């Protein structure tokens, strides 16, 4: 039986009451957002004839999502993070701003307070038995294309099991393992020694993967390395690079892959290269330069204020 009541005055009045629009006090912006979201959800219930059983299954799902702390995982999986990037790209295009280094999603696993050094850092603690040495380096350029000294380059990535320090369920990693902040040298360069990361998948029994299963989708990410780059007079850049050749590089469940952000890991076995890089054996090398953009009327209009773990 088809029931159509959404457009009745009773329902529209009720939406205003439920959203607090008829009450003094509260936050007007929150009221505006809740009214729109409630309206869209009520309309979806009517248009799709969502049953009470389906509705309460959804409520139970949200409870489980919160209990597992996976909202930050589901968000990129449903494309919300990428959509926000698309909106910022469109805003930049309207302002005539060209992003030589594309932005992409931050992800949920940044931790503030990583050890800081100038020019160079060793990121891994050397304890991963499967770790393959990686030398990652590049130059930070300013908005005019000149090397930028004193820029802050924050880098973080997973280990060979796909786990991040501070979020590793095995408890095997030390604090800030594979998390560092590097201040670029007088030539605008940064350099780190670390290990090649592995990609990861959503917890197979968790609510994110359960929903992806219903959508016929996998929950895998390719091997990747995260960046924040900031400098005086420039907008903070949030991006990440994917390791070329990973089977999920162009099939990332989080939709973070973008042209210009796929980097080859070049293998080196030459004894002279091994000696020059002060490593113990064969290693991989990745080179990634980044270019920043100027502030907009003195303001960083792309900085995102969101809850992040701080240690």
Swiss-Prot record:
Looking at the Swiss-Prot or TrEMBL record, what is one Pfam family this protein matches?
A: Dioxygenase_C
GO molecular function term, any single one: catechol 1,2-dioxygenase activity
Q: Which UniProt keywords apply?
A: Aromatic hydrocarbons catabolism, Dioxygenase, Iron, Metal-binding, Oxidoreductase
Coiled coil location: none
Its needed co-factors are: Fe(3+)
Top enzyme class = oxidoreductase
Where, by residue number, does catechol bind?
164, 224-226
Q: Which GO terms describe its biological process?
A: beta-ketoadipate pathway; catechol-containing compound catabolic process
The cofactor note from the UniProt entry for this protein is: Binds 1 Fe(3+) ion per subunit.
Quote the pathway field: Aromatic compound metabolism; beta-ketoadipate pathway; 5-oxo-4,5-dihydro-2-furylacetate from catechol: step 1/3
**Keyword DNA-binding on this protein?**
no
Record bears the keyword Iron: yes
Give the catalytic activity.
catechol + O2 = cis,cis-muconate + 2 H(+)
Task: Fetch the NCBIfam families from UniProt.
Answer: catechol_proteo (TIGR02439)
* Domain comment (free text): Contains a helical zipper domain, consisting of five N-terminal helices from each subunit, which forms the molecular dimer axis.
Task: Fill in the subunit field for this protein.
Answer: Homodimer.
> Family per UniProt?
Belongs to the intradiol ring-cleavage dioxygenase family.
User: Which protein are we looking at?
Assistant: Catechol 1,2-dioxygenase
What gene is it encoded by?
Answer: catA
